[in-house]
Amino acid sequence: MNPDRLPVVDPDKLPRVELELMNDVHREEIALVNALGEQLLTGADGLVDDAAISQCLAAWISHTQEHFEGENRLMQIHGFPPFPVHKGEHDQMLTQLTQIERTWQQDRDAAALAKFLYETWLPWFDTHVKTMDTVTAGFLNRVMQS
């Protein structure tokens, strides 16, 4: 993964799932991630705007918390059998996001934040959408239509 590549996630290449509600949330998240990526790339050119990066990071994390809470709620309401596994992935990523935000607030290291974004979060998100979210969306789409 190249941390100098924008967008971080090409919205046209974002894997789609069977439940449009989930696709909408993913598109919102990608917009926030790409805004953060733009700030980080600007920072790599020596024009670091700590406040803008902090704002983008906080908005992304807040959205991700709401995203995961919404998915978790739907899985619980509709009795999704592997809910604990899917929720466990959400919990792990939220822990990592909280840690990277804490690290950013302490060190203001744009390179470390970019490394996390491209090397940790991006492959996780891609795999999560293609596996966990695809299965979950298929299940939810079926039970919500019946």
Positions of the model-derived regions?
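Small-residue-biased structural context
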Residues: 1-146
